[in-house]
């Protein structure tokens, strides 16, 4: 395997979050503090949650910017440096902070994270926004047509000739990383490159790579006219995205429950691709992307929330 640029070691991430986060005290008793991330999708979702709360209430909302990983976000919540996350992913949390076996069934994955997040961390995992941001192998449209590609298993015919670029963090991932890929699909690539996730799309579009592994909702998929290959042997678990909040903050401000439930099913995979493109390719600030999305949907003012979910979460938080 050729490695173009390595990932930051986990130890460094733990050291970073062990320090005080800038602009935030060690206690969040009086504020709603929302975690953002280093890539556009999590930034947009953090803005959507922030602006929804500000639109529907008079509560004060602060964001922590540029949290680099789910691990850092989890530890920050443990330290009570934040209490709401705009976007968490079922597959990431199952194999990450929950240290459980990957689950390819979306409903089972959602139930596992919902139940275990409440039991282990005293946090509420809300219903999905409506999109699944999973890992996906992708190729250029002309390459797919030339080699008649539509499924990942068909890459076996190109395993010795295709140049394949993947996200650095995926290579060593337990459960659904490269070792799991080789075991599931029964082959490996001769020309295999590890690189930062932000580089894979341009590397594919420019012809430096023939196949890459990226995220299924990235805005550059449409920009570069890329084709997603079907994970026909079901290697990758479900990565449905939801907001997450601590029981403590929901108990203090129970109105947050209905606000976050309004977002259930509000963003399709295609819509998330479009929003990501606006931020990453059109260079529109995530704050503006979120604002325009919410204005188009009238801040979901007329949405009737799922009464079953409302009753469930109120019961878990122990509020009326």
Can you say where each PLM-predicted feature lies in the sequence?
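Immediate post-signal peptide segment of exported/extracytoplasmic ligand-binding proteins
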Residues: 20-34, 153-163, 300-319
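Bilobed "Venus flytrap"/periplasmic-binding protein-like clamshell domains
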Residues: 31-62, 67, 130-201, 284-288
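Beta->alpha turn/N-cap motifs
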Residues: 69-70, 80-93, 109-110, 140, ...
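Ligand-binding "clamshell"
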Residues: 96-107, 111-126, 208, 220-234
